[in-house]
């Protein structure tokens, strides 16, 4: 291979080319990642080689952890939120009781209806006997 002619010259005025620095190779994070991938490849733990069942199990575990965190966040409600929930429940109970009372007033019990029917039939029988 032919060497460039500026190597032979000892001319101080010439700017000698330097090899460019690869920012990816100098990055510490990238080096660590590359090293970890190589180690995993040697051990046979490459991410693309995982069986489908193992991937599904890992996804389920992640989902379960996320769900548990959400539940814990809901359990850690402030005093204000707890008090508001109590008031809301009380209001709902009062509303249900009012609805029940209205239904009872609008729809009398069955025995009251039967008693009214008996009176009417008794009166009708008495009227037919008189006539």
Curated annotation (Swiss-Prot):
The gene that this protein is the product of is FAM107B
**Family of the protein in this entry:** Belongs to the FAM107 family.
Modified positions (N-acetylalanine) in chain numbering = 2
Q: Source organism's superkingdom?
A: Eukaryota
- Regions of biased composition (Acidic residues) lie at 1-12
Give the Basic and acidic residues compositional bias ranges: 52-79
Tell me the InterPro entries matching this sequence: FAM107
* Annotated positions of the N6-acetyllysine modification: 50
**Can you say what this protein is called?**
Protein FAM107B
| Chain intervals for the UniProt region annotation (Disordered) | 1-79, 99-131
Q: Which residues form a coiled coil?
A: 61-108
Arranged from A to Z, the UniProt key words for this protein are:
Acetylation, Coiled coil
